[in-house]
Amino acid sequence: TIPVIYGFGPFCSVALRLKTQFNENSKVLSFCNCLPRIDHDEIMGWEGELADRFTVIFLRNRREDRQMRLRIEATKELIEEAGLRVVELWARGSNRLEKMFSLIYLGDMASIYLALARGIDPYELKSIQAIKLKMAKAGLLEKLSKEISSLKL
């Protein structure tokens, strides 16, 4: 199934990291979003007929505030009632940075294991390299490099 990663607060950036790792390492489509945003629109998509093609991953923190905990539980319940698989990844650590890195590490490893389970080399980046090569041939990289170096930062 296609991973959809949901984070909140500082875990929104972690959700994006996990999405990109599933894309690059596992070579699968993956999506991410943040709570509470998803409860204003995206939650409706789980009522659709394609919903069973996804696995929803919630990034959790044992110290999340009461309101966020209630929101996550309510959202999770609706998604499970729609028949989807839900996974919760719990952060570990004594401070925000440790918790973020614990989830990043777990996501990175999961993306590599998924690639290996699918018989795919997680370090091969054919499509990315092909795009870079086409850009280089078109002179875009050189042009961008010149533009960036001319910026006064």
Describe these PLM feature segments.
Residues T1-L153:
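A SIS-like phosphosugar-recognition module
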